[in-house]
Amino acid sequence: MAGHSHSANIAHRKNAQDAARGKIFQKLSKEIFVAAQKGFDPEMNSALKLAISKAKAKNMPKDNIERAISKAKGDKNSNSFTETIFNATLSGGVSFIVTTLSDNLNRTRSNMTALFNKQNASLGKTGQIPFVFDHKGIIEFSKGELSEDDLMMVALENGAQEIETTDETFVLISNPEDFSQLKKALEDSFKIEEFLQCEILYLPNTYAEVSEEKQQKLLEFIDKLKDDDDVQDVYHNLDI
């Protein structure tokens, strides 16, 4: 990942989210609902705590979060949704990971197959992660008055592997197992209460460059994937 800033890809993700905020909140609510079925206390349920942090970073209203948890409390069917990871590689080396939460896996698989077939791509083995992706935690927050030197000392001691800077923010990357410790250290040491991004995701370690025309078509394809109600997140290694 050295030499390539994740900021451009992060910015694209945010722009897409802003354009479809209602859809994003719907997907986040589902994620919170599924996580909450395993326990309603985020301090005792790491999956719920992560889902709430992710939702807050995307400006999901507190009422929406509480409503999703309340819905889980009243739902006795804890196996209503299945989490699945799909992957595919298109011509030119553009790879995709699509995570889904579905109450009908056959429908979801059929939809994913149809979408990727239109791109002349076949789905890889379900659950398999292409080698061009790394599973990472990512935390982004406003710089405020915090110096990079002070941040670096705390971050590196608590699992940060990379520290990137933009004009107004810091972006920290860690292994998933260090994510919670790093987030807590930032909150405790610097009294950070709001994060612009706070989640565990798949980051590309190799990027694929395509023509401007093909890039535009692929971005439209990414939007189609995100429009599917069963799709939670779409990750790719397209160099934007």
From Swiss-Prot:
One of its GO terms (molecular function) is DNA binding. The keyword Methyltransferase does not apply. Gene3D superfamilies: 1.10.10.200, 3.30.70.980. It is found in: Cytoplasm. Keywords: Cytoplasm, DNA-binding, Transcription, Transcription regulation. Pfam families: TACO1_YebC_N (PF20772), Transcrip_reg (PF01709). Its main location: cytoplasm. PANTHER family: TRANSCRIPTIONAL REGULATORY PROTEIN YEBC-RELATED, TRANSLATIONAL ACTIVATOR OF CYTOCHROME C OXIDASE 1. Belongs to the TACO1 family. This is Probable transcriptional regulatory protein MS53_0373. It comes from Mycoplasmopsis synoviae (strain 53).
